[in-house]
UniProtKB/Swiss-Prot annotation:
UniProt keyword terms in alphabetical order: ATP-binding, Cytoplasm, Kinase, Magnesium, Metal-binding, Nucleotide metabolism, Nucleotide-binding, Phosphoprotein, Transferase
PROSITE patterns linked: NDPK, NDPK_LIKE
Cited function: Major role in the synthesis of nucleoside triphosphates other than ATP. The ATP gamma phosphate is transferred to the NDP beta phosphate via a ping-pong mechanism, using a phosphorylated active-site intermediate.
SUPFAM superfamilies tied to this protein: Nucleoside diphosphate kinase, NDK
Principal localisation: cytoplasm
Cofactor(s) named in the record: Mg(2+)
GO-annotated molecular function: ATP binding; metal ion binding; nucleoside diphosphate kinase activity
Presence of the UniProt keyword Lipid biosynthesis in the record: no
Name assigned to this protein: Nucleoside diphosphate kinase
Family to which this protein belongs: Belongs to the NDK family.
One Pfam assignment: NDK
Name of the coding gene: ndk
One GO cellular component, as annotated: cytoplasm
Length: 137
């Protein structure tokens, strides 16, 4: 069974949508095998998004991701990465298909409610940033 890493971002949490997003995750057939509510420090956000450290949006992204609580998760399902990315929708909520999480709960590109790994290798690195193997059920 494939795994992926997911985040319910601070904007969705602040808007009171974390529970609605979690409900959709379960409704769509994902199994949550790891879940933590946390507030990333600026340093933790910079470490997690280090792959983007030379990009112009890096400072804004890490400031936003350390601006409030979020939920980090490890999801499991058949074809999990593609299935989760499809449920999230396009990065820009305005371009996301109706019914997708980003269309429903996101507002702008930088505050688009959710994050998801884009490949198995990325998922492995990202989930290990927040979870040890002993924490995944």
């Amino acid at each position: 069974m494939e795994k992926t890493f997911a985040i319910i971002k601070p904007d969705a949490f602040a808007a009171g949508n974390a529970g609605k997003i979690l409900a959709r995750i379960y409704q769509e057939g994902f199994t949550v095998i790891g879940l933590k509510k946390l507030c990333m420090s600026q340093r933790e956000a910079e470490g997690f998004y280090a792959v983007h450290n030379k990009k112009p949006f890096f400072a804004e992204l890490t400031k936003f991701m350390s601006s409030g609580p979020c939920i980090v998760m490890v999801l499991e399902a058949e074809g999990c990465i593609g299935k989760w990315r499809d449920l999230m929708g396009a990065t820009n909520p305005a371009d996301a298909k109706p019914g997708s999480l980003r269309r429903e709960f996101g507002t702008i590109v930088g505050e688009n409610a959710t994050h998801g790994s884009d490949a198995p290798e990325t998922a492995a690195v990202e989930l290990e940033y927040f979870f040890s193997g002993l924490e995944l059920l």
